[in-house]
């Protein structure tokens, strides 16, 4: 069993012990991912990139880690509930991105793949 599957198993057990599956529809989990991601963003709102990389990351490391974990938990549960192999999905997406953004065209560029020449 992979580490991802082990985490999904722990999340499933936590959820099932509390009889929360009834609330964890794919729609509700997707909404929860967005809400938790917004809570993560609040830690970086209205500050410079430099401050977000150093000062805030150090000052709020615990709170930021908690919000990242919240997003990850809902993401792992959503993929589990939908029968999506998250490792496989990530690897497929990385391969797709590698094809869309070849190193020789994309290095140092923030352009969308349709704009790369």
Please provide the spans of the model-predicted regions.
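Flexible "arm" and connector segments at domain edges
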Residues: 1-117
């Amino acid at each position: 069993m992979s580490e991802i599957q082990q985490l999904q198993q722990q999340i499933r057990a936590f959820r099932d012990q509390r009889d929360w599956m009834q609330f964890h529809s794919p729609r509700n989990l997707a909404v929860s991912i967005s809400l938790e991601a917004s809570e993560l963003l609040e830690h970086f709102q209205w500050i410079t990139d430099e401050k977000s990389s150093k000062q805030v990351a150090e000052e709020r490391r615990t709170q930021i880690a908690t919000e990242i974990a919240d997003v990850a938990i809902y993401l792992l549960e959503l993929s589990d509930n939908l029968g999506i192999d998250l490792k496989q999905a990530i690897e497929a997406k990385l391969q797709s991105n590698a094809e869309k953004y070849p190193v020789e065209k994309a290095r140092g560029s923030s352009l969308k793949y349709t704009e790369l020449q």
